[in-house]
Amino acid sequence: MRIRIFVSWKPRIGEFRVHPFRWLTITILALVLAACSPGAPKDAEVVIPQGASIARAGEILEEAGLVSASSFRNQARFFGSYDPIKPGEYKIEKGMDAGDILALFQSGKTIQRLVMIPEGMPSIMVWERLMAEKRLKGEIPVPAEGSILPDSYAFTTGETRAAVVKRMQAAMDKVFAELWAKRKPRTAVKNRNEALTLASIVEKETAVPAERRTVAGVYTNRLAVGMRLQADPTIIYPVTKGKPIGRRILRSEIQAVNDYNTYAMAGLPKGPIANPGKASIAAVLDPEPNDYLFFVAKGDGSHIFARTLAEHNANVQKWYALRRERGEME
């Protein structure tokens, strides 16, 4: 524990010259008292609100059973710097004294909480996750689909949800600008909306990193020859806003005409169906040069690709046979 002297009165002029031993006695006594003053008896987390005074911070510490309000005030009065204390959530470690805590509050080294947005999460679920985080405050609308970069984001207790969303969207803007500048002539997309839309489809179609450019190549080829994309996730999006459907897709949903269903329309949907990650965006801006037009699941999370409809139909039958073995089909 660091020793600090708390002296609340000043000597009269000449007093130190006349009574040097009195001052020595006072100094020694102050050192002893400071040494005996206990630090925080436990680890704890405290929140210092915006605009809190030294006195209020001391009260918060005392209420938490960490250090007395008076010792904290005295530390700030006699030995603290002029730096203001900063709001936020702080980790107080066992043994920290008033001076340690004051320095921590002035440093602004708050606890950094994390909110994780996985690749392919739709905006409605991003909104739900942020609204469920009770350490954040404020209302927000559902962010525009495709505007959020999936990643882990740090925040502090009491921060606004709007501020967190703003960082997420700024991250997407930055990453997209970097990738767009490196796009290859082969890409099928002409602008940001098209790029994020196709990237969101790639994101939802495969979770295998090595397949992203291959899947992007398939869709690039289909767009080039005027074939419908026929991507199952585009059927689901109008039904659930991107949430898992939890059942088999209905025939009526496959045939539904809307702005997203790529079984019933040519070209790209009107906008993204999820928030794509950096790798999927990069894949559609630099798709694999291949001549595949079809792909179907293999049953292990990956896909098998085909150049012709005959090859594809054979692969589909293998997939159906596997599903029957698993009891997923009759």
Residue ranges of model-derived segments:
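Bacterial extracytoplasmic/cell-wall-associated proteins, especially those involved in peptidoglycan
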Residues: 127-142, 146-330
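Extreme N-terminal basic, low-complexity initiation segments
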Residues: 2-6
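Signal peptide-directed extracytoplasmic domains
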Residues: 37-181
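Bacterial N-terminal signal peptides
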Residues: 24-34
